[in-house]
Amino acid sequence: ILMQGRAAGKKFVGCHSLEELVANLSAPRKVMMLVKAGPAVDTIIDSLLELLDAGDIIIDGGNTHFTDTERRTKYVEEKGLLYIGTGVSGGEEGALKGPSMMPGGSELAWPLVEPIFKAISAKVGPNDDIPCCEWVGPRGAGHYVKMVHNGIEYGDMQLICEAYHMLKEAGGLDNDQL
C-alpha cells in the first residue's frame, strides 16, 4: 500500500524471477539487492553469478558487516564481475524521496553506477542539487562507513532517551512539558 499509485507514469518492468530480471537488463547489468544481511546475500550472489556475465555489477544495499563485503567483493571479482557494498540510509522517507548512499567495493564499478546513484540519492544544499552520495573507497568501505553512521545515530538516540529520562525523573517534567 505504501507504494500504491507511486509508479503511475513511470517506466517499470515487473519480473517474476532472477532469470527474467537479468534478461531485461542491458550490459553491463547492474543488480542491486536490498535484503537482510547474512546468508541470504550469499545465496542471491551465487544465483546471480550463474546468470550474469563478466563486467556486470552486483550491489548489496543491506546492512552487511564490512568484513562480509570484503569477502564478497573478492569472491565476485574472482568470477570476473564487479561488486559494490553500499550503505543506504534514510528509512521509509529515504526510500520514497532518496536515501543517503555510501558506496564502496570494486572501484571499476563506480563510474558505471555513479550517475544512477547520484540521481536517486537525497539532495542537499541551497538548491537541493548536491547528491548525498559519494564513493567512499575499496572493498568494504561503504558498509564500514554505514556501520560508523549507525553507531553515531544510535548513540544520539541513547543520549536523547537519557536526557528525557533525567528531565522527567529528576526534573519533574511530564510528557507534555517535554
Predicted regions and their residues:
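Rossmann-fold dinucleotide-binding core
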Residues: V41-I44, D60, H65-D176
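Tryptophan-centric aromatic hotspots in well-structured domains and transmembrane helices
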Residues: I1-L2, M32, E93
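Short low-complexity, flexible loop/linker segments enriched in glycine and/or proline
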Residues: M3-A7, R29, G98-M101
